[in-house]
Amino acid sequence: MRVLAVVLAAAFSVAAAAPPVVLAERGNPPACTIVTRADASACERYAAQELQRFLKRQTNVELPLATDAEPLPDHAILLGATRYSAGILGATNAVAALGDEGFRLKAVPPHVLVLGGSGRGPLYGVYELLERFGGCAWYSLRFEVVPELKAFSVPADLDETQRPTFELRSENWNGHGRADDFAARNKLNLESFGEKLGGTRFRFDPVLGKCHTFARLVPPEKWFDTHPEYFSLVAGHRLRNHSQLCLTNPDVLRICTEEVMRRIAESYPKGIRYYGVSPNDWQNACECPACAEVDRRAKSRAGTLIAFVNRIAEEVEKTYPDVFIQTLAYSYTRRPPVGIVPRRNVQVCLCTIECDFSKSIPESRAIENRRVRHDFGVWGRSGCSLSVWDYASDFGAYHHIWPNYGALRGNLEFFEQQGVRQVFTLVNGGGPNEVWSNIRCWLLAKWMWNPRLDEKALLDRCFKDHFGPAADDVWEYFNLLRDAPRDTKRFPMGCFSNVYGPGLDETVLVRASAILARAEARVKGTQYAENAHLARIPVDFTRVLRGAARPSLSRKDRDLAKWLDERDAARRLVGIMDRPDGLSLCDDLAGRTAFTARIRALATKETPEKPGRLRLTLDETHLTGSYPATVFRYVEDPQARDGKAILLPGKAGACTAWLDFQSLDLDADGLYIPRIRVRASPCGRDVLPFRAGVYNRIFRRVVNSFGPDAIDIQMGVEKYRWYTLGVVSPRMGDTLWIGLGDAGDPNAAAPDVWIDRVEIVRIQ
């Protein structure tokens, strides 16, 4: 027995020591031939070309391409289900269980098989080979890692099968959502994928797209004048502007069904199978008796929506059984209705816009996360087709420190547990120079494929690729932000957070800045210097906006060393902003203008402002806009002091300009009087031309409201006039707002409002 054990041990040792299969070796002739089926799909042929291209970049060896119509080479990399694959494996039907995107990597020396169906499986398998054994990585359109190698080899015992967790994996960050080849290298699959990349089953109609389609189905400009009953009844009025549809009106159902069927007839032959029927991107659900009764019984305003969409889907299914009608569980329709279950061909897209993103949905203590957990669970148990529209940026300020890394993987695991099969993540970002957004999107792509991939292993690789010898410094920075205390129960980290609001403590920001300065110094003059420099953007941006860039009415001297440090940060930001590809600072024009003006103003200063000023005058660039930000704009105005003003168009309905008091350096115990220089377009004497007040954005309540009596608003006066508001003692979250007035009729446009400037006067 002892002799047998020794022999077996020796045999296992020999097997374990089997030499790797060499695919290409620098300085030698090609070791392998890449073989595809003679009738290979365009995607399989592209997979072969990608493997050939990257192996040549890595080893300077160009492997020949062949098909299985030719004799099997002595050493082959077989892509897809070639006629030789089953024989080499000793198994038939080797790819059936892999689906369109799954793959199996199998070494059978001297051959290597990359198995997959005729879809993207072989292509994804090629990228896995290149990442795993070649050290390749594609982080952004401008930063990829393709190491030069002496030899490219794979283990002789390689045998691994992978299938994606989600059938649709999409995000819209630079490259991932706008360059198909790049997205495919990260195992994403986009609606735009053409034949070369395996096409897609998930294309949406170009008119009835993913979201907010009511106004396209029943345009108010076409129907409201003759049929106001088609539109939502709110507070006793049918609304033309910012309206939804009356979903219990049979004519609305007929018109929508006809339009959906017309769109399907036009786009179905092009391979489109998804059509959106969903509310517009605001509130104002219909409150008519019929709609109110359906929603009352369903205990949710999604009751009328799902019942309505079910009726359309039922009609569609008769002719197009493979078509899906998608609608939104978003805002007021997120709560699942009681007793109304979506049909088989209805897809419900769940949205996470209200969440706290400092932690994953299951982990966060924020009240909205608890509600989302409940709602997702009920939708999941309904058995309907589920997709998710997730959010992974701070849209209020793209470069604000917003450490949502603790939510990325956990949320995807949560979505999988609820039965979600399709995920789209909105990751609008600050431009290609934003290293941290690139890293965030790379992580998302990895976890959309497999949310169980180890975070530390991924980040280790990512930080070493980006920062080289400074990787440990960046780990220290990353852990500092992740572990820093935050009161997310009271102040959740939402996706429209306030750069001036409660968040990371100033001591954390100072320490973070010092760590990244050390990292940049460590790699100065190396290939990693640019990434280390760009990695400082979020800390610099947050410190500048919360610190020295704030106009001051304080009685206290500024800390000179701190001021100089923040001034240097502003100069670093301006250096990046002035590049051709620059930085996109915010989701809307007003925010971009305000942030840009303050950063540039600080960068040009030589000394801080002297304390003790009694009056602070701010031009229009210091104001930001609230939703809908697209209608808030800057205009030439000869009546304004500097010839420019903010225009709030009356037809916009809800457009408002804001000045966050935390964007100013004010004393905590100070008393101040805000004044505004405003004019409005001609209006009747019974029309309120504008409103103003103070609103707390953290606690979501009105602090002061300055009406006509309080501020002596003159009706119908077109010239600028200063209006003095009440005394305020601003607290965290307090914000001065100036908004449109009231025409007395919800369907009549309010007067246009021009805002020239704001003045803050210190009285104590």
Language-model features: where?
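Short beta-strand-plus-loop segments that form exposed binding edges in beta-rich domains
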Residues: 739-749
